[in-house]
Regions:
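Alpha-helical transmembrane segments and adjacent TM-loop junctions that form the membrane-embedded core
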Residues: 4-228
Length: 228
């Protein structure tokens, strides 16, 4: 979890580094790479949880339910509070979503451990521990799948979620003076910035700057702040 938060913070810092002759867009895409890495790490963690849970199903181990419940209870509070800090912006930035899911997943695991600890304390059913573990693994997989899908999409320069390429082309075509729009490309510079390039034919070259300004203003309203 600490590594996940450090990676997210590092990506935020790199995103603000100015472009140079070798990296003409700067290091903005580091936020996408980190969100993808966080998704992969979460899935690896799920694999470990599943493997350990299956092993416990076939090789039950007696545990002190009371001790693990109290210990995990502390984890619930810490992880839940940390996840809450990221909750507000998790739908606006994949990098934030990755960090949020890490902390939320840990909070969920801790809740599961507390629940199994209490049940074991009062019933002695040690088998409940791996069963809850498998249930938690399923929940994490479902919640992480969207992060993995969106991160892969942005890594491959796909059109960001929430942006409709056909609608964007229509917006451009509706601007005064525009006759045609082709070779339209839309991709993510980072988890918060979207770029666009297009060949646009206008009916009067003397109005070039005016038409460009209208198009850029319309695109900014549509969530695209870097257009050429």
């Amino acid at each position: 979890d600490v590594a996940s938060l450090v990676l997210a913070m590092l990506a935020f810092r790199l995103q603000k580094v100015h472009p140079n002759s070798r990296y003409t867009y700067g290091y903005k895409k580091s936020t996408i790479l980190v969100s993808l890495l966080n998704a992969v790490i979460l899935l690896v963690a799920v694999g470990i949880i599943i493997a350990e849970s299956i092993d416990k199903l076939f090789h039950p181990v007696s545990v002190d339910g009371s001790a693990i419940a109290w210990t995990a209870g502390v984890g619930v509070v810490i992880n839940a509070l940390t996840a809450w800090l990221f909750m507000k912006d998790k739908d606006k930035d994949l990098n934030v979503k990755g960090a949020y899911l890490h902390m939320a997943a840990d909070a969920l695991v801790s809740v599961g451990v507390v629940a199994s600890g209490i049940i074991i304390t009062y019933t002695g059913w040690s088998i409940i521990d791996p069963i809850i573990g498998l249930g938690i693994a399923v929940v994490i997989i479902v919640s992480t799948w969207g992060l993995l899908h969106d991160s892969l999409r942005l890594s491959l320069d796909g059109v960001p979620v929430g942006i409709d390429a056909q609608k964007i082309q229509q917006i451009i075509m509706e601007q005064p003076g525009v006759e045609n729009c082709h070779h339209l490309h839309i991709w993510a510079l980072s988890t918060t910035e979207t770029a666009l390039t297009a060949h646009i034919v206008i009916d009067n070259i003397t109005q070039l700057e005016e038409v460009k300004q209208h198009i850029k203003e319309a695109l900014e309203e549509a969530g695209i702040h870097h257009a050429t």
